[in-house]
Amino acid sequence: LLEDECKQKKKKMSTPNFEQLLEAGCHFGHLKRKWNPAMAPYIFMERNGIHIIDLYKTAAKLEEAAAALKNIAKSGKKVLFVATKKQAKQVVADKATSINMPYVIERWPGGMLTNFPTIRKAVKKMTNIDKMTKDGTFDNLSKRERLQITRQRAKLEKTLGSIADLNRLPSALFVIDVMKEHIAVAEANRLGIPVFAMVDTNSNPNNVDFVIPANDDASKSIELILDTVCAAMAEGIEERKAEKADAPAEGEEKDAAPKRERRRVRKADAEVEAAAEESAE
């Protein structure tokens, strides 16, 4: 039994080993002349003018980040994934959708976090257009108006469709390439929202709360890291569902206990009254 439990624990929250990280090319950094000295603790060596990332540190940091993201997902909160670079877009869209998390893969809308109410208004506009289409109001408009609204809807969908369900500020950001997404990182820093990120040797890790030192340019590297964190978050979501299913049963037991207690009290009161009557006689 203990062996089975250990195996199950190993199956859960599994992070890639050194060989898997190596195979995905997570160790390739940038040219030495492009490096950011703040990344020095995560650099293993320099080879042919290119910095090589220490994959043992990558594995440790990835495990730490995955555990923290699992807890966020388990508490029912949202993590916003941000990746507007070509090689990361589709992977991020697929992985975030699979765990029902919001994401931004087109241009980052300035003020997305710091001016969140305005962004919500734009999302509401999109919802209103959908309502118009359903209730027939849209059909009563002129051809020109319909065309304008359709174009507006398509534009909003492209930039905000993936965050339509984000009703409040996210509890964390997961960023691929902090240099490219520096505006998103700055907004999160300003609001005290934790930032998880894949950080390459040319980037500044100081504005990131959970640094995952890794190659943020190769699609295989991006996919492996995302697979790991999304699998951990999926576990957190499943655990939350399981706990919610158990909660009503516990609640029923708690309700039953006071009833039993009340019965005992009534019985004791009745016995006291009977004894009092006997002594009076």
Task: Enumerate the predicted regions with their spans.
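Residue-level signature of catalytic and energy-coupling elements of molecular machines
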Residues: 25, 81, 173, 225
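Short glycine/threonine-rich loop/turn motifs
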Residues: 184-187, 191-243
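Intrinsically disordered, compositionally biased charged tails
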Residues: 1-15, 235-281
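Short amphipathic alpha-helical/adjacent loop interface patches that line ligand
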Residues: 66, 153, 226
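Conserved beta-strand segments of the P-loop GTPase G domain that flank and frequently precede/overlap
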Residues: 53, 82, 175-177, 198, ...
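N-terminal cationic and glycine-rich segments that engage phosphates or anionic surfaces
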Residues: 12-78, 84-85, 89-132, 143-146, ...
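Short beta->alpha junction loops/turns
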Residues: 58, 84-85, 178, 201, ...
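Long, charge-patterned amphipathic alpha-helical coiled-coil/hairpin "stalk" segments used as oligomerization
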Residues: 99-206
